Amino acid sequence: MLFKSFVTFTVLANALAAPLAHQHHQHKEEKRAVHVVTTTNVVVVTIGNGDQTTTFAAPSVAAESSVSVSVNTEPPQNHPTTTQDVASASTYPSSTDGSAASSSAAASSSSQAGSEPSGGVGSGGAKGITYSPYSDNGGCKSESQIASEIAQLSGFDVIRLYGVDCSQVEAVLKAKTSSQKIFAGIFDVSSITSGIESLAEAVKSCGSWDDIYTVSIGNELVNAGSATPSQIKAYVEEGRKALKAAGYTGPVVSVDTFIAVINNPDLCDYSDYMAVNAHAFFDGHVVAENSGAWVLQQIQRVWTACGGKKNVLITETGWPSRGDSNGVAVPSKSNQQAAISSIKSSCGASAILFTAFNDLWKADGPYNAEKYWGIYSN
């Protein structure tokens, strides 16, 4: 597992994690709120990576845990997590060698098994940031507007895109710095092969496969109740085959929420590393300044659910600047800044922030906050 900071957590030994609620962000052709729950128990785990180790209290998924997915239009009921019981994180050096989280663990997906591409953290303070090519009215931003906005994101090593429409891949390839890479996405799983053909054409005309950090097939499909784990397997296999034919040999993943992976550990077998979305705001029991500890805990929970075989990258995490409160989670610009600072400090090297700019084309969404997650928007 890749961490920017190595952290010790203490959790009450007899604590029992209550069910979690998670909602996902709207993207094109997606308008549903989802409630997924699981039951976990707390165990203490020590993992290592090279010459550093991490000790944490990681919830382990109970053997009898079952999936509960319901699609509805109401915000899910919120329940506290064990994050409230987690002590303040502190970084520390260590010379102890360990291998429990080594990316050399075998997996069935590909030669990239378990591994996330190497790379550090730029001046942006996190691995990357998500970007949307849609204007306020839902149309496509111009190439010049995309270039101007991407220039503001030069401090991030990775720019995450969700699809191939609006010529977004071409525009971002032209606008990004030579050292930046794109986390590309095939959003429409009904046309995976054609989506990859569009991606390949964009890469051929404006860059090379070296510019692509990872390719994701689908986003939060299990969490949304739109696909089963076995369907995700088929989607990823189709995507991997088409990508290989197009000359791409890098990592292929399917992004879902942390709770969907915990509830469906079969998902661990299909992606080359675990790419999961996790937002403390939707928990409702985490204040903004504790977001980093909460996100790090979800990284640890996913890592545990996957048997320590796969590195974990958070592919969405952030905080809204406007909207209605969700328990103790209060949207505001100052709270957004506090949350982002906390995430960068605790796990920035393992996190892609959500999102660069406000998405005013979206519906108001849960807590009337869906439009207002833009970190660089006023």
Swiss-Prot record:
<dbReference type="GO" id="GO:0005576">
    <property type="term" value="C:extracellular region"/>
</dbReference>
<dbReference type="InterPro" id="IPR050732">
    <property type="entry name" value="Beta-glucan_modifiers"/>
</dbReference>
<keyword id="KW-0964">Secreted</keyword>
<feature type="compositionally biased region" description="Polar residues">
    <location>
        <begin position="72"/>
        <end position="93"/>
    </location>
</feature>
<comment type="function">
    <text>Surface mannoprotein required for hyphal morphogenesis, surface adherence, and pathogenicity. Contributes in a high proportion to the carbohydrate component of the matrix due to high levels of glycosylation and may play important roles during biofilm development and maintenance. Acts as a major antigen target of host cell-mediated immune response. Induces extensive T-cell proliferation of human peripheral blood mononuclear cells.</text>
</comment>
<dbReference type="GO" id="GO:0009277">
    <property type="term" value="C:fungal-type cell wall"/>
</dbReference>
<dbReference type="GO" id="GO:0052553">
    <property type="term" value="P:symbiont-mediated perturbation of host immune response"/>
</dbReference>
<dbReference type="GO" id="GO:0043709">
    <property type="term" value="P:cell adhesion involved in single-species biofilm formation"/>
</dbReference>
<dbReference type="GO" id="GO:0030445">
    <property type="term" value="C:yeast-form cell wall"/>
</dbReference>
<dbReference type="InterPro" id="IPR017853">
    <property type="entry name" value="Glycoside_hydrolase_SF"/>
</dbReference>
<dbReference type="Pfam" id="PF00332">
    <property type="entry name" value="Glyco_hydro_17"/>
</dbReference>
<feature type="active site" description="Nucleophile">
    <location>
        <position position="316"/>
    </location>
</feature>
<dbReference type="GO" id="GO:0005975">
    <property type="term" value="P:carbohydrate metabolic process"/>
</dbReference>
<dbReference type="GO" id="GO:0036244">
    <property type="term" value="P:cellular response to neutral pH"/>
</dbReference>
<keyword id="KW-0843">Virulence</keyword>
<comment type="similarity">
    <text>Belongs to the glycosyl hydrolase 17 family.</text>
</comment>
<keyword id="KW-0378">Hydrolase</keyword>
<dbReference type="GO" id="GO:0036170">
    <property type="term" value="P:filamentous growth of a population of unicellular organisms in response to starvation"/>
</dbReference>
<dbReference type="GO" id="GO:0007155">
    <property type="term" value="P:cell adhesion"/>
</dbReference>
<dbReference type="GO" id="GO:0036178">
    <property type="term" value="P:filamentous growth of a population of unicellular organisms in response to neutral pH"/>
</dbReference>
<keyword id="KW-0130">Cell adhesion</keyword>
<dbReference type="GO" id="GO:0009986">
    <property type="term" value="C:cell surface"/>
</dbReference>
<keyword id="KW-0325">Glycoprotein</keyword>
<dbReference type="GO" id="GO:0030446">
    <property type="term" value="C:hyphal cell wall"/>
</dbReference>
<keyword id="KW-0326">Glycosidase</keyword>
<dbReference type="GO" id="GO:1903561">
    <property type="term" value="C:extracellular vesicle"/>
</dbReference>
<dbReference type="GO" id="GO:0042973">
    <property type="term" value="F:glucan endo-1,3-beta-D-glucosidase activity"/>
</dbReference>
<feature type="region of interest" description="Disordered">
    <location>
        <begin position="67"/>
        <end position="124"/>
    </location>
</feature>
<keyword id="KW-0134">Cell wall</keyword>
<dbReference type="GO" id="GO:0042149">
    <property type="term" value="P:cellular response to glucose starvation"/>
</dbReference>
<feature type="compositionally biased region" description="Low complexity">
    <location>
        <begin position="94"/>
        <end position="116"/>
    </location>
</feature>
<keyword id="KW-0732">Signal</keyword>
<comment type="subunit">
    <text>Component of a multiprotein complex of 250 kDa composed of at least HYR1, MP65, and PRA1.</text>
</comment>
<dbReference type="GO" id="GO:0071555">
    <property type="term" value="P:cell wall organization"/>
</dbReference>
<dbReference type="GO" id="GO:0031589">
    <property type="term" value="P:cell-substrate adhesion"/>
</dbReference>
<dbReference type="InterPro" id="IPR000490">
    <property type="entry name" value="Glyco_hydro_17"/>
</dbReference>
<protein>
    <recommendedName>
        <fullName>Cell surface mannoprotein MP65</fullName>
        <ecNumber>3.2.1.-</ecNumber>
    </recommendedName>
</protein>
<keyword id="KW-0961">Cell wall biogenesis/degradation</keyword>
<feature type="signal peptide">
    <location>
        <begin position="1"/>
        <end position="32"/>
    </location>
</feature>
<dbReference type="GO" id="GO:0030447">
    <property type="term" value="P:filamentous growth"/>
</dbReference>
